[in-house]
Amino acid sequence: MSTDHRINNQAGFILHTYPFKETSVVAEVFSREHGRVALIARGARRPASALRGLVQPFTPLLLSWFGKSELKTLHGAEWQGGLIAPQGRALMCGFYLNELMLRLLARGDAHQALYDAYVLTLTQLAEASPDMFEQILRRFEKTLLIETGYAATFDKEAGSGETVRAEWTYVYQPERGPWRAAEDQRGPWRAKEDQRGPWHANGNARGPEGVSVSGKTLLHLAADNFDDLTTLAEAKPLMRALINHYLGAKPLYTRQLLRELTELNEPT
């Protein structure tokens, strides 16, 4: 009986590669059925290697591997086609998605809904005009946070469980969700006066750490509605704060590149 734990013909994408020894690479893979997996592609850096042109990001593949350790061995890769590779700014957005998943996904945890969302997002980035990229990225960020268990609910108040109201302002806290801001709020950080617990603000104390956001935007996020311009404007700092909370101190490299690219393209 075979004991090498062979996995065959799994749909997946390469998120990132780095050199391994003289002629090989380690490929960080996101597969539909097995989640994130690290695979050694032996000889993939040789000019004549059949893997050389396949072990690339944004290429839909059928992957086969074996091994019992965390670092497994790739023994087959087949191009599936059917996906237009992103170009230009869309390509940078694609690398941003890959870096997010490398940083936030644990190895070996399957996320089939996230995989499907990733394929859809790559397709949309390749086909959409640049003015749609913000909407596309915010939707994927939300899906990633929910699928990995990092995002609390958007349409229910933390603590009370009451439905968020569009006309009210909230402070969204990572790991907790939205807290209603005070009706006489002096700024976006003042907490509702009847709140108690570690996030309660009284006297001159600062309110709960979080991001000020309208109830309307929270309801739109819960409904996966990113068509409203105000929702897009408020969703960006909210998603960034949530992602940064879980990333820790190390910033995203691709986010900085996207920022610099935007600045270069702005009229002077």
Over which residues does each language-model region extend?
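Non-catalytic alpha-helical scaffolds and adjoining flexible linkers that form interface surfaces
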Residues: M1-V26, F30-T268
